[in-house]
Amino acid sequence: MSRIGKMPIKVPPGIKVDINGNDVTVKGPKGTLSRSFRPEVTINREGDYLVVAPVGTDKATRSFFGLSRTLLDNMIVGVKDGFDKNLEIVGVGMRADKDGDKVVFKVGFSHSVTVAPPAGITLSVDGTTKVKVSGINKEDVGQMAAEIRSIRKPDHYMGKGIRYAGEYVRIKPGKAIGKGAK
């Protein structure tokens, strides 16, 4: 059995979980999330805990067992605390500006790039070089952060571009000068 899958999930006070077959709805102070889970797993409530159990022992069932437990745990954490991902802009003249709910990136192109967040995601700009992506759905927050990073990935010669906060970018050495024929 999956080590992650067999751990029960504690439901904190103030969080309401509705289980209807394989459809689960989680309501909390930050919002509501719903998800349909695979038929290979069953989700049951036992007191203040949620327990995910596999239906069979084949490989497909085992592969969805731990995944389902983690997705359910992320739903509970999301409606209780939310998720956020921080991005940094590195480079001379590169910046981000807030324009209503949109963010305008000026990252070395001849044009500016405007990013509008989808429903449930908020973008905030701290200064001109830090962007924060927040929301209750961990998958959507990560996807939005990845899309913003893909606007201008950090280059490996100067390190300029948009990167995750704390991300290490390996800088390659430039061309060697003075080596070769005389």
Swiss-Prot record:
Pfam families per the UniProt record, alphabetical: Ribosomal_L6
One annotated Gene Ontology cellular component of this protein: cytosolic large ribosomal subunit
Superkingdom field: Bacteria
Similarity comment text for this entry: Belongs to the universal ribosomal protein uL6 family.
GO MF annotation: an example: rRNA binding
SUPFAM superfamilies, per database record: Ribosomal protein L6
Function, in words: This protein binds to the 23S rRNA, and is important in its secondary structure. It is located near the subunit interface in the base of the L7/L12 stalk, and near the tRNA binding site of the peptidyltransferase center.
Lineage: Bacteria, Bacillati, Chloroflexota, Dehalococcoidia, Dehalococcoidales
UniProt-recorded name of the protein: Large ribosomal subunit protein uL6
Organism: Dehalococcoides mccartyi (strain CBDB1)
Gene name per UniProt: rplF
Subunit architecture: Part of the 50S ribosomal subunit.
Biological-process GO terms, alphabetical: cytoplasmic translation
